[in-house]
């Protein structure tokens, strides 16, 4: 447990996470100061009166006078104001670092470009099925500090690369990097390896490292060691086994579950299930209750979620596909009887869209591209693409064209912030329009 008495603490970024940091310090007799680049940040009205605040920008004077800065994952450590504070010797951490200094129960830590929310939730469900008092959150749901409780027996945290950059005290009982594909390249000027290095921090003091046998970028820098357990499609300690048209989850050669007993579908979800099982096994959760959780878990909203099935047409909301790798996961091995009507677009965050090209072949696919990077996406295969300003225009364009056996898939490969509040709002709009047009 760290001692923050008489420390001059500055919190950057409000919202739910920022407020959880404020509460954390107030409970320890320390009154922090808060700043946010937004003029009216969310949660401003919930900030206790005694907490000094500075909005609409950063206050360099406060930062340089601080003993400790707690930075929101939304602000880059490379920001000139933070660089100056770091150079002046000010300690800069995030909420996850504060959490790790206090947590008494084992931590399962999950990161990766795609699938981390599903795997985090699944491991949480496995723990609940075993009757374990578990706190699930971090980059999903509740901020980590709101989970702290002396009665907890386990924590399951989803961690982003930004959160890991400011964390040094994490000693996970089990940690995984599910996959590494381009994302947030606007925050990583040195490219994929810089982004990967942030993700790999999760392994630093971990007891067990769960790695993806199909993705060498998920391996610790020094290579797999005796701490490593692997999962993969065909390779790995935890893998898939296909026999006579049936697919099984297998652990070290032993069949443990037929995927038809699971509510989740799609190869990417089967590998998510393998990763979750490996993590649950690593922290000693009973296998039987973990498998039971796999048969009841229905998946998360906006993640390859069936929004509507009507007149033989399936409308799928995969709005959470905010990067290229996530859309690749949706398209890989996808079976459609008729034509796939694929909605792509939004803010691509400087990503390279070319890996999608291999999935856009044949004559049973149509592209509808919208938003800031719509033109770039339409250029992947112009002869089957139509570009519109908004997603709604695209959906009104495609609706009269769909036939029984077709699929309409929103898997945009882009962030939503150019036209929507967040990916949830984008998914909700898609679902509403699907019900209206389908």
Swiss-Prot record:
EC id: 6.3.2.9
Ligand binding (ATP): 112-118
Keyword Cell wall biogenesis/degradation set for record: yes
InterPro entries recorded: Mur-like_cat_sf (IPR036565), Mur_ligase_C (IPR004101), Mur_ligase_C_dom_sf (IPR036615), Mur_ligase_cen (IPR013221), MurD (IPR005762)
Parts of the chain that traverse the membrane: none
Keywords, ordered alphabetically: ATP-binding, Cell cycle, Cell division, Cell shape, Cell wall biogenesis/degradation, Cytoplasm, Ligase, Nucleotide-binding, Peptidoglycan synthesis
This protein's pathway: Cell wall biogenesis; peptidoglycan biosynthesis
The keyword Hydrolase is annotated on this UniProt entry: no
Catalytic activity: UDP-N-acetyl-alpha-D-muramoyl-L-alanine + D-glutamate + ATP = UDP-N-acetyl-alpha-D-muramoyl-L-alanyl-D-glutamate + ADP + phosphate + H(+)
GO biological process, one term: peptidoglycan biosynthetic process
GO terms assigned for molecular function: ATP binding; UDP-N-acetylmuramoylalanine-D-glutamate ligase activity
Pfam family, one: Mur_ligase_M
Job of this protein: Cell wall formation. Catalyzes the addition of glutamate to the nucleotide precursor UDP-N-acetylmuramoyl-L-alanine (UMA).
Cited PANTHER family: UDP-N-ACETYLMURAMOYLALANINE--D-GLUTAMATE LIGASE (PTHR43692:SF1)
UniProt record similarity statement: Belongs to the MurCDEF family.
HAMAP family: MurD
Protein name per the record: UDP-N-acetylmuramoylalanine--D-glutamate ligase
Origin species: Salmonella typhimurium (strain LT2 / SGSC1412 / ATCC 700720)
């Amino acid at each position: 447990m760290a001692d923050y008495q008489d420390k001059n603490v500055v919190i950057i970024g409000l919202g739910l996470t920022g407020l959880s940091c404020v509460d954390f310090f107030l409970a320890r007799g320390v009154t922090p100061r808060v700043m946010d680049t937004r003029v009216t940040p969310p949660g401003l009205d919930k900030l206790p009166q005694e907490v000094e605040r500075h909005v609409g920008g950063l206050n360099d004077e406060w930062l340089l006078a601080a003993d400790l800065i707690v930075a929101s994952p939304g602000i880059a450590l490379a920001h000139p104001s933070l660089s100056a504070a770091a150079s002046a010797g000010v300690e800069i951490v995030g909420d996850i670092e504060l959490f790790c200094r206090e947590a008494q129960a084992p931590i399962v830590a999950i990161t990766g470009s795609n699938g981390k929310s599903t795997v985090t939730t699944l491991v949480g469900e496995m723990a609940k099925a075993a009757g374990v008092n578990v706190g699930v959150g971090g980059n999903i749901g509740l901020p980590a500090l709101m989970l702290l409780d002396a009665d907890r027996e386990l924590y399951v945290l989803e961690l982003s690369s930004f959160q890991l950059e400011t964390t040094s005290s994490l000693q996970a009982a089990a940690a995984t990097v599910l996959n590494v594909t381009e994302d947030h390249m606007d925050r990583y000027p040195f490219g994929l390896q810089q982004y990967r290095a942030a993700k790999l921090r999760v392994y630093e003091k971990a007891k067990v490292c769960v790695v993806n046998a199909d993705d060498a970028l998920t391996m610790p820098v020094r290579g797999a060691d005796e701490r490593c357990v692997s999962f993969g499609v065909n390779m790995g300690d935890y893998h898939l086994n296909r026999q006579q048209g049936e697919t099984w989850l297998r652990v070290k050669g032993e069949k443990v579950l037929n995927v038809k007993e699971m509510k989740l579908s799609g190869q990417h979800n089967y590998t998510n299930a393998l990763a979750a099982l490996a993590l649950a096994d690593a922290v000693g959760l009973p296998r039987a209750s973990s498998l039971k959780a796999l048969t009841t878990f229905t998946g998360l909203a906006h993640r390859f979620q069936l929004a509507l099935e009507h007149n033989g047409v399936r409308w799928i909301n995969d709005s959470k596909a905010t990067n290229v790798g996530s859309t690749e996961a949706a398209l890989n091995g996808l079976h459609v009887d008729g034509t796939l009507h694929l909605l792509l677009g939004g803010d691509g965050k400087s990503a390279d869209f070319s890996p999608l090209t291999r999935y856009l072949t044949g004559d049973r696919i149509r592209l509808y591209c919208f938003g800031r990077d719509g033109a770039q996406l339409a250029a992947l295969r112009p002869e089957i693409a139509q570009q519109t300003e908004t997603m709604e225009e695209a959906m009104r364009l495609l609706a009269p064209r769909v036939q029984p056996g077709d699929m309409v898939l929103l898997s945009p490969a882009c962030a939503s912030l150019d036209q929507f509040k967040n990916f949830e709002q984008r998914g909700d709009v898609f679902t509403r329009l699907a019900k209206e047009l389908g």
